[in-house]
Each structure stands twice: as structure tokens, then as C-alpha cells.
Curated annotation (Swiss-Prot):
Coiled-coil intervals: 48-78
Subunit structure: Component of the Mediator complex.
Entry's localization field: Nucleus
Protein name as annotated: Mediator of RNA polymerase II transcription subunit 11
GO cellular component, one term: mediator complex
Provenance organism: Kluyveromyces lactis (strain ATCC 8585 / CBS 2359 / DSM 70799 / NBRC 1267 / NRRL Y-1140 / WM37) (Yeast)
Record-level GO BP terms: regulation of transcription by RNA polymerase II
GO MF annotations in UniProt: transcription coregulator activity
Family: Belongs to the Mediator complex subunit 11 family.
Function: Component of the Mediator complex, a coactivator involved in the regulated transcription of nearly all RNA polymerase II-dependent genes. Mediator functions as a bridge to convey information from gene-specific regulatory proteins to the basal RNA polymerase II transcription machinery. Mediator is recruited to promoters by direct interactions with regulatory proteins and serves as a scaffold for the assembly of a functional pre-initiation complex with RNA polymerase II and the general transcription factors.
The keyword Transcription is annotated on this UniProt entry: yes
Keyword Transcription belongs to the record: yes
Name of one Pfam family that matches: Med11
Domain of life where this protein originates: Eukaryota
Length: 116
């Protein structure tokens, strides 16, 4: 079963954002590493630290903007392209109950009697 074009686009966009966030973490690691070198009185690493810090902020800004766009698209499409989903924040364990209910219905419709 293929996914609708809209869903595929959203998943591709989220995968791209995920890669950007990995880059942000990598850049943060490089920035901290160059800061440690700088703290050890290695003044030669100052330009490297500045470059890493700038690239960290650039990557973070890009990922944040893309993620906000995806959230906005999600908000705009709830109820039109996507089903409205209402969950209660304190309803943590109800997902297992619902899952078991769905499995029971599925086995009933398939004609299989499953003992739990």
C-alpha cells in the first residue's frame, strides 16, 4: 500500500530535519572540543572555535525553521488531510488498552478465536 503524496513529502521533510539535527549535534561537539582547546591557552584554535560556533548556530536555525514549518503544516491539516486526534496528557497507559481492543476486534473479524 503506497502512501499519499502529501504524507510522503512530510516524511521526507522530517527525515531531512532529522539529518539536520544530527549535524547540529555534531557541530556542537566540534564547538565544545575547540572551546576546550581554546581554554588550554591554545589561541590558534580561536578561529576554529568561532567557525564551529557560527556553523552550529546556522545549522540550529535552519533545523528550527524547517521544524516550525512542519508543525505549522500539521496544524493546518488536522481535520482536513489528517484525522483530528485528541489525547489527554495524563492518559498514559490507555494506548495498550486500545491496542488490545483493536486486536480483539481484528481477530473477531478474521474469524480467529485467540485466547489472551
Amino acid at each position: 500500500m503506497s502512501q499519499p503524496e502529501y504524507i510522503r513529502e512530510r516524511l521526507d521533510s522530517l527525515a531531512k530535519i532529522d539529518k539536520q539535527l544530527v549535524d547540529v549535534l555534531h557541530r556542537a561537539s566540534l564547538t565544545v572540543s575547540s572551546l576546550i582547546d581554546l581554554k588550554k591557552r591554545n589561541e590558534e584554535s580561536k578561529p576554529q572555535f568561532q567557525q564551529n560556533a557560527q556553523e552550529f548556530y546556522d545549522d540550529l536555525e535552519s533545523a528550527t525553521v524547517q521544524l516550525r514549518k512542519e508543525i505549522k503544516l500539521l496544524d493546518e491539516n488536522v481535520g482536513t488531510r489528517l484525522l483530528p486526534i485528541q489525547t489527554h496528557k495524563k492518559a498514559t497507559g490507555q494506548d495498550n488498552v486500545k491496542l488490545e481492543e483493536q486486536f480483539k476486534l481484528l481477530t473477531k473479524y478474521l474469524g480467529k478465536d485467540q485466547q489472551s
